[in-house]
Amino acid sequence: MSAPTNWNDLKKDITRRMDSAVEVLKKEFSGLRSGRASINLLDPVVVEAYGQTMPLSQCGTVGVPEPRMLTVQVWDKSQVKAVEKAIANAGLGLNPQADGQMIRVPIPPLNEERRKELQKVAGKYSEQARISVRNVRRDGMDTLKKMEKDGHISEDEIKKHEKEIQAITDETIKKIDEALGHKEKEIMQV
């Protein structure tokens, strides 16, 4: 995409890219096991089925009947063992149990040490998101300076727009911090 040449396009681009960083963070957080069942917990699971590897979502439907239980309704009875094996070997510390075409996956409670590890990982994810946001801010400031140099905006407008970019940045960082606080609380909940 070419660099924006007016303030409205630049503002839209900055907002879109910063919002994208927050969405990526939330997706990463959804993959962190917090001791509670979440359908996203099984997103990284890939199944060896029909001579190829495929995501679990293409083999069955994941459900959350209870806070500490996931279920996988496997569509093809012949693939139940493959799905069960894929969940067990996914490195998530889960122990699936097949019951006909339904696989039950109890979510074990996290010990204190594992909770602290997950908090650190969540902190790293949020720091990566903050870095992305700061990079977008820097790109926006650089583009503003280029727009001034090219005669698209005045020096007074630059000052005003720099403040707006900073306000968007601050708001996005606040969203990241709120998401981190929520995830840490979820992780530490026993």
From Swiss-Prot:
GO terms for molecular function: ribosomal large subunit binding. GO terms for biological process: cytoplasmic translational termination. Keywords: Cytoplasm, Protein biosynthesis. Signal peptide: none annotated. InterPro entries: Ribosome_recyc_fac (IPR002661), Ribosome_recyc_fac_dom (IPR023584), RRF_sf (IPR036191). It is found in: Cytoplasm. The keyword Protein biosynthesis applies. GO terms for cellular component: cytosol. CDD domains: RRF (cd00520). It comes from the Bacteria. Responsible for the release of ribosomes from messenger RNA at the termination of protein biosynthesis. May increase the efficiency of translation by recycling ribosomes from one round of translation to another. Belongs to the RRF family. This is Ribosome-recycling factor. It comes from Paramagnetospirillum magneticum (strain ATCC 700264 / AMB-1). The gene is frr.
